[in-house]
């Protein structure tokens, strides 16, 4: 026999404005993807800027040596 319910069972979700936990959780993969893409774009477009080279890129372990400027003595003007 089928058990009948007297009325609909409502559940209140905790929210902040129109944001609730399941909604925010569904956006996390997109935010991670676009955040990584934005970080990659910033890294690409600031690679040639000396301020970024000295501040960030030279301090990267193992790969930081690529951005350290060390010219040959023959190439330096006197």
From Swiss-Prot:
Knocked-out gene: effects: Leads to decreased vegetative growth on several carbon sources such as citrate.
InterPro entries listed in its UniProt record: Cytochrome_b-c1_su10_fun (IPR019182), Single_a-helix_sf (IPR029027)
Keywords noted in UniProt: Electron transport, Membrane, Mitochondrion, Mitochondrion inner membrane, Respiratory chain, Transmembrane, Transmembrane helix, Transport
GO biological process: mitochondrial electron transport, ubiquinol to cytochrome c
Residues on Mitochondrial matrix side: 1-26
Domain of life of the source: Eukaryota
Membrane topology: Single-pass membrane protein
Mitochondrial intermembrane side: 47-78
Transmembrane segments: 27-46
Keyword Ribosomal protein: no
Annotated compartments: Mitochondrion inner membrane
GO molecular function: ubiquinol-cytochrome-c reductase activity
GO cellular component: mitochondrial inner membrane; respiratory chain complex III
Matching PANTHER family: CYTOCHROME B-C1 COMPLEX SUBUNIT 10 (PTHR28254), CYTOCHROME B-C1 COMPLEX SUBUNIT 10, MITOCHONDRIAL (PTHR28254:SF1)
Function: Component of the ubiquinol-cytochrome c oxidoreductase, a multisubunit transmembrane complex that is part of the mitochondrial electron transport chain which drives oxidative phosphorylation. The complex plays an important role in the uptake of multiple carbon sources present in different host niches.
Family designation: Belongs to the UQCR11/QCR10 family.
Quaternary structure note: Component of the ubiquinol-cytochrome c oxidoreductase (cytochrome b-c1 complex, complex III, CIII), a multisubunit enzyme composed of 10 subunits. The complex is composed of 3 respiratory subunits cytochrome b (COB), cytochrome c1 (CYT1) and Rieske protein (RIP1), 2 core protein subunits COR1 and QCR2, and 5 low-molecular weight protein subunits QCR6, QCR7, QCR8, QCR9 and QCR10.
Protein name, per record: Cytochrome b-c1 complex subunit 10, mitochondrial
Organism: Candida albicans (strain SC5314 / ATCC MYA-2876)
């Amino acid at each position: 026999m089928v058990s009948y319910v007297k009325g609909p069972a409502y559940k209140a979700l905790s929210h902040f404005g129109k944001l609730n936990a399941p909604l925010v959780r569904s956006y996390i993969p997109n935010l991670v993807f676009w955040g990584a893409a934005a970080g990659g774009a910033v890294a690409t477009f600031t690679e040639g800027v000396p301020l970024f080279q000295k501040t960030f890129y030279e301090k990267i372990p193992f790969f930081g040596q690529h951005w350290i400027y060390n010219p040959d003595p023959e190439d330096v003007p006197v």
